[in-house]
Amino acid sequence: MGRGKIEIKRIENANSRQVTFSKRRAGLLKKAHELSVLCDAEVAVIVFSKSGKLFEFSSTSMKKTLLRYGNYQISSDVPGINCKTENQEECTEVDLLKDEISMLQEKHLHMQGKPLNLLSLKELQHLEKQLNFSLISVRERKELLLTKQLEESRLKEQRAELENETLRRQVQELRSFLPSINQHYAPSYIRCFAIDPKNSLLSNTCLGDINCSLQNTNSDTTLQLGLPGEAHDTRKNEGDRESPSSDSVTTSTTRATAQRISLV
């Protein structure tokens, strides 16, 4: 047998009245808390008992809520803002938009899986179906992006392989060309030849300034640049040029000696 309906009137018994007040007060504060959490509403409850004791609840801050309430009361007293004025149609449209926004926000929260206590089984099944459709769409989009990235990576890999093959061919061509140069030409660029001892006769016969100048101009080693085939010809021509120069120097030395003897 169900519980009978309680008649709403003042309880005459003081003890029963106090017990009922405590129970109903706790239930009221609990409902206010649930309302603030489920609906994301700013709720404030103020209760004074028969003896004057204060009981209050606020989802944010009691002072903040009271200040907001006072500002709302002031703005509603200004002409043209109250919905019960000439702009009743506009206010009705605004209320409809607010309700629609509130409903969309509630659906958004349901999609996140937050306030599900008040949903029925049918609503939960419908929500599950929507989430499955959304999940399928997300997976398809993800697979498409991954396939695109994979294709781009393959193209980059093919380009890199072609560039590496081209560079490898160029290196092989250079390697096949450089050894021939090193074998035939590189060793013969610089060669040294010793001077024939016959060309150094002036080292013992020069006198005074002539001896010093000739010693500064002669050396034991000369540097010759040229190809291998030109080495013998160069040495031969050098010997031919040095022979007459040696004779001319000897003649000039003899003349200088004769002049000094005549002066004495």
Curated annotation (Swiss-Prot):
Keywords: DNA-binding, Nucleus, Transcription, Transcription regulation. Gene3D superfamilies: Transcription factor, MADS-box. GO terms for biological process: positive regulation of transcription by RNA polymerase II. Residues 87-177 form the K-box domain. One of its GO terms (molecular function) is RNA polymerase II transcription regulatory region sequence-specific DNA binding. Disulfide bonds: none annotated. Its main location: nucleus. Residues 3-57 form the MADS-box domain. InterPro entries: MADS-box/MEF2_TF, MEF2-like_N, TF_Kbox, TF_MADSbox, TF_MADSbox_sf. Pfam families: K-box, SRF-TF. It is found in: Nucleus. Residues 223-264 are annotated as: Disordered. Residues 245-257 have a biased composition (Low complexity). The keyword Cell membrane does not apply. Residues 230-244 have a biased composition (Basic and acidic residues). CDD domains: MADS_MEF2_like. SUPFAM superfamilies: SRF-like. One of its GO terms (cellular component) is nucleus. Probable transcription factor. This is Agamous-like MADS-box protein AGL15. It comes from Brassica napus (Rape). The gene is AGL15.
